[in-house]
């Protein structure tokens, strides 16, 4: 008998549904590097339509999607991108924009709601007269939802204002929209409207949407033409990629409608309901006798997987394969785990499911 494991480490842990597996097996495929895979072409066209952009491109990962997007906009070494100091691109993507693209990150503090102050963005834009001394600002990056602030949503109004700032200074705007559909559902705003101001958007298919692999980037035809070359340069060109796109199509079609339920379950897990906007719950641990590492170890012994978010906090992420009974079981296990640790009866050992490592942007 297989023991049920409640896996709340991330929404990246979902397993392909039977429908996805069947679609992958039946997918009509050809060589996508040659531009001939019909399933990939149909999926990319559908994603461009949904996102309100001219074209789309499937890429193996969100990290590659963001990297390709930044390099497409900043195609001259010595370019500079303005982005949040607590953003996924800046913290969790191996510094790829600088190590591979020669693009300098100019950070602006992220507020607790994931935004950056508009006036600080403007102040970070390099003046052309300083070209002898400074990099050239070419791009602004936003993240929606914002992972490190607990899945906070950036509003249409805010995004539009940043877009206006960019246009007035001749800059492009890229949105790291790994969980953009979560933001769309939480805000009640169509996703195409949410990203209207952006010149490019990356969308993760394997987080909240539940596909097994991949991300998609969207933008103008000219942007996607450049992105295709960069994807190949970075080793992201794949052959019969329609197998993956078939699963991704079902993820977009079938899972977006379930995201509101994920958000509801996250609120059940939360102590402070106002702090939860989407599917991510962060909770701080005040008692010094309980560390995130210890708590996650004891939870794993009860078949609940969570992940430390920092030295004092734990993160739980709901997804469509978490049931209401899973949520209630988790709450019970957290209560019992705390009691066990405080009583001195807990046993600690290094476990194997990644629960004792930082979330690292998952």
Give residue ranges: language-model regions.
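Conserved PLP-enzyme active-site core in the AAT-like
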Residues: 2-322, 326, 330-362
């Amino acid at each position: 008998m297989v023991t049920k494991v409640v896996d709340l480490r991330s929404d990246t842990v979902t397993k392909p549904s039977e429908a996805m597996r069947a679609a992958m097996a039946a997918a009509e495929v050809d060589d996508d590097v040659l531009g001939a895979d019909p399933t990939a072409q149909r999926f990319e066209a559908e994603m461009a339509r949904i996102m309100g952009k001219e074209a789309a491109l499937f890429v193996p990962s969100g990290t590659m999607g963001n990297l390709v997007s930044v390099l497409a906009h900043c195609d001259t070494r010595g370019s500079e991108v303005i982005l949040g100091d607590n953003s996924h691109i800046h913290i969790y993507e191996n510094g790829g924009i600088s190590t591979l693209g020669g693009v300098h990150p100019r950070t602006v503090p992220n507020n607790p709601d994931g935004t950056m102050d508009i006036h600080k963005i403007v102040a970070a834009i390099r003046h052309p007269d300083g070209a002898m001394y400074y990099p050239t600002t070419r791009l602004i990056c936003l993240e929606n939802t914002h992972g490190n602030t607990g899945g906070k949503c950036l509003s249409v109004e805010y995004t539009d204002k940043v877009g206006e700032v960019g246009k007035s200074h001749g800059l492009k705007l890229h949105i790291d929209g790994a969980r953009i559909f979560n933001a769309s559902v939480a805000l009640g705003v169509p996703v195409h409207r949410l990203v209207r101001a952006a010149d490019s958007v990356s969308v993760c298919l394997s987080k909240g949407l539940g596909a097994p692999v991949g991300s998609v980037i969207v933008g103008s035809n000219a942007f996607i033409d450049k992105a295709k070359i960069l994807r190949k340069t970075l080793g992201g060109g794949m052959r019969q990629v329609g197998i993956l796109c078939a699963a991704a199509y079902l993820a977009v079609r079938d899972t977006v409608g379930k995201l509101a339920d994920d958000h509801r379950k996250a609120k059940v897990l939360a102590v402070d309901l106002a702090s939860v906007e989407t599917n991510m719950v962060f909770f701080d641990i005040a008692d010094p006798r309980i560390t995130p590492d210890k708590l996650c170890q004891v939870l794993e012994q009860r078949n609940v997987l969570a992940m430390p978010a920092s030295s004092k906090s734990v993160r739980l992420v709901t997804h469509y394969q978490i049931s209401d009974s899973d949520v209630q079981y988790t709450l019970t296990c957290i209560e019992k785990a705390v009691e066990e640790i405080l009583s001195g009866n807990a046993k600690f050992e290094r476990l194997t499911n990644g629960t004792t490592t930082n979330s690292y942007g998952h």
